[in-house]
Protein backbone atom coordinates (compact mmCIF):
# COMPACT_ATOMS: atom_id res chain seq x y z
CA UNK A 1 0.00 0.00 0.00
CA UNK A 2 2.96 2.35 0.58
CA UNK A 3 3.86 2.35 -3.11
CA UNK A 4 0.27 3.31 -3.98
CA UNK A 5 0.37 6.23 -1.53
CA UNK A 6 3.55 7.48 -3.17
CA UNK A 7 1.87 7.33 -6.57
CA UNK A 8 -1.17 9.22 -5.31
CA UNK A 9 0.72 12.23 -4.00
CA UNK A 10 2.86 12.82 -7.09
CA UNK A 11 1.82 16.03 -8.82
CA UNK A 12 1.63 14.46 -12.27
CA UNK A 13 -0.75 11.79 -10.99
CA UNK A 14 -4.00 13.48 -11.96
CA UNK A 15 -6.92 11.69 -13.58
CA UNK A 16 -8.35 13.75 -16.42
CA UNK A 17 -11.88 13.08 -17.60
CA UNK A 18 -13.97 14.81 -20.25
CA UNK A 19 -17.63 14.52 -21.21
CA UNK A 20 -19.57 16.92 -23.45
CA UNK A 21 -18.38 20.38 -22.30
CA UNK A 22 -17.18 19.19 -18.87
CA UNK A 23 -13.54 18.75 -17.91
CA UNK A 24 -12.61 17.14 -14.58
CA UNK A 25 -9.22 16.89 -12.88
CA UNK A 26 -9.40 14.16 -10.26
CA UNK A 27 -7.14 13.34 -7.31
CA UNK A 28 -7.45 10.27 -5.08
CA UNK A 29 -6.34 10.68 -1.48
CA UNK A 30 -6.24 7.99 1.21
CA UNK A 31 -9.37 8.45 3.29
CA UNK A 32 -12.70 7.02 4.29
CA UNK A 33 -14.86 7.64 1.23
CA UNK A 34 -15.66 11.34 0.89
CA UNK A 35 -16.21 13.31 -2.30
CA UNK A 36 -15.04 16.91 -2.60
CA UNK A 37 -15.93 18.71 -5.84
CA UNK A 38 -14.73 22.28 -6.40
CA UNK A 39 -13.97 22.66 -2.67
CA UNK A 40 -17.53 21.75 -1.63
CA UNK A 41 -19.09 18.52 -0.42
CA UNK A 42 -19.86 16.09 -3.23
CA UNK A 43 -23.39 15.52 -1.95
CA UNK A 44 -24.14 19.22 -1.91
CA UNK A 45 -22.48 19.91 -5.28
CA UNK A 46 -24.37 17.07 -7.00
CA UNK A 47 -27.62 18.24 -5.34
CA UNK A 48 -28.00 15.04 -3.26
CA UNK A 49 -28.83 13.12 -6.45
CA UNK A 50 -28.12 9.40 -5.96
CA UNK A 51 -27.68 8.79 -9.70
CA UNK A 52 -24.82 11.30 -9.91
CA UNK A 53 -23.21 9.99 -6.72
CA UNK A 54 -23.41 6.39 -7.94
CA UNK A 55 -21.87 7.44 -11.25
CA UNK A 56 -18.89 9.01 -9.47
CA UNK A 57 -18.40 6.06 -7.09
CA UNK A 58 -18.92 3.20 -9.56
CA UNK A 59 -15.23 2.61 -10.58
CA UNK A 60 -14.18 2.40 -6.93
CA UNK A 61 -17.12 0.14 -6.08
CA UNK A 62 -16.17 -2.34 -8.81
CA UNK A 63 -12.71 -2.60 -7.22
CA UNK A 64 -14.07 -2.62 -3.63
CA UNK A 65 -12.03 0.48 -2.76
CA UNK A 66 -14.85 2.92 -1.91
CA UNK A 67 -13.91 3.12 1.79
CA UNK A 68 -10.16 3.52 1.18
CA UNK A 69 -10.03 6.73 -0.88
CA UNK A 70 -11.41 10.24 -0.91
CA UNK A 71 -12.19 11.75 -4.31
CA UNK A 72 -11.11 15.36 -4.82
CA UNK A 73 -12.20 16.81 -8.17
CA UNK A 74 -11.96 20.17 -9.89
CA UNK A 75 -14.63 20.41 -12.59
CA UNK A 76 -15.39 23.08 -15.18
CA UNK A 77 -18.12 23.49 -17.78
CA UNK A 78 -21.25 21.60 -18.72
CA UNK A 79 -24.08 20.39 -16.53
CA UNK A 80 -24.17 18.04 -13.58
CA UNK A 81 -24.59 14.87 -15.65
CA UNK A 82 -21.60 15.65 -17.84
CA UNK A 83 -19.55 16.67 -14.82
CA UNK A 84 -20.38 13.47 -12.92
CA UNK A 85 -19.45 11.35 -15.94
CA UNK A 86 -16.23 13.32 -16.43
CA UNK A 87 -15.27 12.67 -12.80
CA UNK A 88 -16.07 8.97 -13.28
CA UNK A 89 -13.70 8.78 -16.26
CA UNK A 90 -10.99 10.65 -14.35
CA UNK A 91 -11.29 8.29 -11.36
CA UNK A 92 -11.13 5.22 -13.61
CA UNK A 93 -8.05 6.51 -15.44
CA UNK A 94 -6.34 7.35 -12.17
CA UNK A 95 -7.04 3.88 -10.77
CA UNK A 96 -5.43 2.38 -13.88
CA UNK A 97 -2.26 4.42 -13.41
CA UNK A 98 -2.08 3.27 -9.78
CA UNK A 99 -2.32 -0.43 -10.60
CA UNK A 100 -2.17 -1.97 -14.09
CA UNK A 101 -4.40 -4.89 -13.01
CA UNK A 102 -7.31 -2.48 -12.48
CA UNK A 103 -7.49 -1.88 -16.23
CA UNK A 104 -8.65 -5.43 -16.98
CA UNK A 105 -11.38 -5.10 -14.34
CA UNK A 106 -12.67 -1.64 -15.36
CA UNK A 107 -12.46 -2.00 -19.15
CA UNK A 108 -15.41 -4.46 -19.57
CA UNK A 109 -17.71 -2.07 -17.67
CA UNK A 110 -16.86 0.77 -20.08
CA UNK A 111 -15.33 3.04 -17.45
CA UNK A 112 -12.23 3.75 -19.56
CA UNK A 113 -14.08 4.67 -22.76
CA UNK A 114 -14.38 8.38 -23.54
CA UNK A 115 -17.91 9.17 -24.74
CA UNK A 116 -17.11 11.37 -27.73
CA UNK A 117 -20.66 12.54 -28.43
CA UNK A 118 -20.83 16.33 -28.34
CA UNK A 119 -23.47 18.87 -29.29
CA UNK A 120 -23.88 19.36 -33.03
CA UNK A 121 -23.52 22.93 -34.21
CA UNK A 122 -26.47 25.01 -35.38
CA UNK A 123 -26.63 25.56 -39.14
CA UNK A 124 -27.85 28.76 -40.76
CA UNK A 125 -31.33 28.54 -42.30
CA UNK A 126 -32.37 26.08 -39.60
CA UNK A 127 -33.79 26.65 -36.12
CA UNK A 128 -31.46 24.20 -34.38
CA UNK A 129 -28.83 21.75 -35.60
CA UNK A 130 -31.37 19.79 -37.65
CA UNK A 131 -34.78 21.34 -36.98
CA UNK A 132 -36.05 23.16 -40.05
CA UNK A 133 -38.76 25.83 -40.13
CA UNK A 134 -42.23 24.56 -41.01
CA UNK A 135 -42.64 23.86 -44.71
CA UNK A 136 -45.49 25.64 -46.49
CA UNK A 137 -46.43 24.46 -49.97
CA UNK A 138 -48.29 27.68 -50.88
Curated annotation (Swiss-Prot):
GO MF term (any one): RNA binding
Keywords: Chloroplast, Plastid, Ribonucleoprotein, Ribosomal protein
Keyword ATP-binding: no
PROSITE patterns with a match to the protein in the record: RIBOSOMAL_S9
Domain of life: Eukaryota
Signal peptide per UniProt: none
Pfam families found in the cross-reference section: Ribosomal_S9
Subcellular location: Plastid, Chloroplast
GO CC field: chloroplast; small ribosomal subunit
Keyword Plastid part of the UniProt annotation: yes
GO terms for biological process, alphabetical: translation
InterPro entries: Ribosomal_Su5_D2-typ_SF, Ribosomal_uS9, Ribosomal_uS9_bac/plastid, Ribosomal_uS9_CS, Ribsml_uS5_D2-typ_fold_subgr
Family, as annotated: Belongs to the universal ribosomal protein uS9 family.
Name by which UniProt lists this protein: Small ribosomal subunit protein uS9c
Amino acid sequence: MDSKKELIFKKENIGLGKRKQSIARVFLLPGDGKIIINKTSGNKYLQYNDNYLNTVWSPLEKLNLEKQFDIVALVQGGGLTGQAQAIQLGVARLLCTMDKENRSILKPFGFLTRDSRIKERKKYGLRKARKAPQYSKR
